[in-house]
Structures are given as structure tokens and as C-alpha cells.
């Protein structure tokens, strides 16, 4: 009995230490969040420039696999500041997604494929509806995901929604074991985002994400936020417009 209790205590201690270490890696100051968003923006521009300008550079494509997971993690952390996802913020996100769609098409993407802002908007809307525990809203959430699936071929599809949902839940989880399970899910979902493309893309996405998170967690803890609130969606639309013009 004593041995069993000792083993249980050791296991609990290991879980606690692991959880503390993971929180030091995954919980960032406002300045660190902006650093991660900046890295993600650079990776996104490299990826889009490579595709839109037909540069055909493998390293640019592989580096770009880290952009979406980084944005998703920051998004999940930002949402955790509020008890519930605010519908006003979701509406603003829908607006930016609709505005950016023209520039997405202008840059050379199929008109019927939704841009990545739609993935964030769909995920936020689905999560909000599911939180209400209303039958018709749950049905609406399922319908929205079903409709989004065929339109999300260039925006990570259902795997992208899963990545966003796990990121959202990770920063709201209060139980240590739940957080560890969610981190394990992240380590599986991040490669899954690009597994259909190639094994190299799947590995690159995970490596770029882990490397960025590891480096940023060691610096910038006292740095204040330096990007305005709507900088990302504004930059997203503008960079598509610029790349579209360059591709003419």
C-alpha cells in the first residue's frame, strides 16, 4: 500500500511539473503574442509569395506550414481572456473574411475557396453556438461545418477547425490532466494539417511551430503589445492585394 501511494505521489508530481513547464511554453505576454504573430506573418508571406508568384521554392513552402498553427495558438490564448467568445468580435471577423475574399481571388486562389479568415470565423461561430447548449444552434453549427468543408480546400479544411477548437479549449482547461491531453492532441493535429500534402510538410509544420514557441517563450516576457488590434486582418488583405498586383 505504501509503495502504491509513493508511486501515485510521484506520478502526480511529474504531471504537475510537466504542466508547469508547458504553461511556461504556451502562455505568453502581450508582447510575446505579437512576436509570434509577426513570425507567423513572415511565414505566411513566404508561403503565399511562393505560390502566387510561382517561385517554386520548397523551403518557402515548408516554412509556411508553421504559420497557421502559430496563429491558431495565439487566437486561442486571446479568446481565453473572456468568459465567452463575443459575438461582436465574431461579426467583425466575418466582415474581414468577406472583405479579404476578393483579394484572395485577385491573388489567384479559386473564387469558391474560402480564405483563412473564414476558418477562424467559422470556428468561433461554431464554438459560440455549441456553448449555448441549444438544439437548433447545435444543428446550425453542424450545418455550418458541413458547408465549410467543401469550400476550405486551401484553408486546412476540417483539420483546421479542429486545430482552432483544440487551441481554444487548451487555454480554458483548468484540469492539469486535461491540458496535457490537449497538448498531446495538438502534437497530432499540427502534422495532420499538412499530412495530405506530404510527410515533409507535416513534419515542417510541427518543427516550425515548436521551434518558434520554444524560442519566443525564452524572451520578450516584459515586452508590451506593439501591433494594433486589427493589424492581422488588415495586413492579410493588403498582402494579398500586393502579391496579386505583382503576379499580373
Swiss-Prot record:
One Pfam family recorded for the sequence: TraX
A GO CC annotation given for this chain: plasma membrane
Chain segments annotated as coiled-coil in the UniProt record: none
Subcellular location: Cell membrane
UniProt keyword list: Cell membrane, Membrane, Plasmid, Transmembrane, Transmembrane helix
Topology of this chain in the membrane: Multi-pass membrane protein
Bilayer-spanning residue ranges: 39-55, 180-196, 200-216, 232-248
Name of the protein in question: Protein TraX
UniProt organism field: Escherichia coli (strain K12)
Amino acid at each position: 500500500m505504501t509503495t502504491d501511494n509513493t508511486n501515485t505521489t510521484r506520478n502526480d508530481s511529474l504531471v504537475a511539473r510537466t504542466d508547469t513547464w508547458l504553461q511556461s511554453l504556451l502562455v505568453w505576454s502581450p508582447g510575446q503574442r505579437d512576436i509570434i504573430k509577426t513570425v507567423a506573418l513572415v511565414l505566411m508571406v513566404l508561403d503565399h509569395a511562393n505560390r502566387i508568384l510561382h517561385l517554386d521554392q520548397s523551403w518557402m513552402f515548408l516554412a509556411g506550414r508553421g504559420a497557421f498553427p502559430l496563429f491558431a495558438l495565439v487566437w486561442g490564448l486571446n479568446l481565453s481572456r473572456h468568459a465567452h467568445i463575443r459575438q461582436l468580435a465574431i461579426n467583425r471577423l466575418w466582415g474581414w473574411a468577406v472583405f479579404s475574399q476578393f483579394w484572395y481571388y485577385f491573388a489567384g486562389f479559386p473564387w469558391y475557396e474560402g480564405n483563412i479568415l473564414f476558418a477562424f470565423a467559422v470556428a468561433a461561430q461554431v464554438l459560440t453556438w455549441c456553448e449555448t447548449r441549444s438544439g437548433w444552434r447545435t444543428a446550425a453549427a453542424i450545418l455550418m461545418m458541413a458547408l465549410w468543408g467543401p469550400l476550405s480546400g486551401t484553408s486546412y479544411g476540417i483539420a483546421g477547425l479542429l486545430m482552432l477548437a483544440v487551441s481554444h479549449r487548451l487555454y480554458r482547461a483548468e484540469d492539469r490532466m486535461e491540458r496535457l491531453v490537449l497538448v498531446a492532441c495538438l502534437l497530432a493535429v499540427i502534422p495532420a494539417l499538412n499530412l495530405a500534402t506530404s510527410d515533409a510538410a507535416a513534419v515542417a509544420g510541427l518543427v516550425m511551430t515548436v521551434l518558434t514557441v520554444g524560442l519566443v517563450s525564452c524572451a520578450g516576457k516584459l515586452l508590451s503589445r506593439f501591433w494594433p488590434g486589427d493589424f492581422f486582418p488588415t495586413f492579410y488583405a493588403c498582402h494579398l492585394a500586393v502579391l496579386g498586383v505583382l503576379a499580373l
